[in-house]
């Protein structure tokens, strides 16, 4: 044991060497961002799938007591519980004026998150996604969930992010299990 971990006062009182014990903890602040630009989606059904994916991820994080910062277009929130988060998700509507660089607006509100989830549609190109994640801190983990109604689930790892294709909401538990 390192001498810096010796609790000298307790050691002097007890007459034997007392070592500090630390509990391993890791705070995981999570930023959840969904693209609300309808140009990123094939149709309204795909947009609704994206909203459902976004909502499911947020609820899971909140149930695990992980702090969440949620972003949808110009709306930014720090929900305290799953009900509050789902209420916010019920108001997510398409917005053609949404900033295509989701990371830029996310970083304005959650610059120190350790985990970034971006939910986009299948029309968001891989080049756009790669450009988007460049701004994120290297120490953070980034997962891009691409809603693509009817497509087979898939996971592809890149150097700075992981891309998961979600063709059906029922695919999400398996995808998240692989990513865990």
Where are the predicted features?
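Exposed, interaction-prone extracellular/peripheral surfaces
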Residues: 1-180
């Amino acid at each position: 044991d390192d001498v810096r971990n010796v609790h000298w006062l307790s050691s002097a009182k007890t007459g034997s060497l007392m070592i500090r014990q630390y509990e391993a903890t890791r705070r995981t602040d999570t930023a959840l961002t969904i693209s609300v630009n309808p140009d990123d989606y094939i149709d309204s059904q795909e947009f609704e799938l994206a909203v459902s994916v976004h909502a499911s991820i947020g609820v899971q994080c909140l149930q695990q007591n992980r702090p969440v910062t949620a972003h949808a277009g110009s709306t930014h929130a720090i929900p305290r519980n799953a009900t509050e988060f789902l209420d916010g998700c019920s108001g997510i509507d398409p917005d053609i004026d949404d900033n295509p660089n989701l990371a830029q607006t996310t970083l304005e509100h959650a610059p120190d998150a350790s985990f970034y989830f971006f939910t986009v549609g299948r029309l968001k190109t891989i080049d756009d996604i790669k450009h988007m994640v460049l701004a994120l801190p290297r120490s953070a983990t980034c997962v891009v969930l691409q809603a693509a109604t009817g497509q087979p689930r898939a996971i592809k790892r890149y150097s700075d992010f992981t891309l998961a294709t979600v063709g059906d909401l029922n695919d999400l538990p398996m995808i998240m299990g692989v990513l865990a």
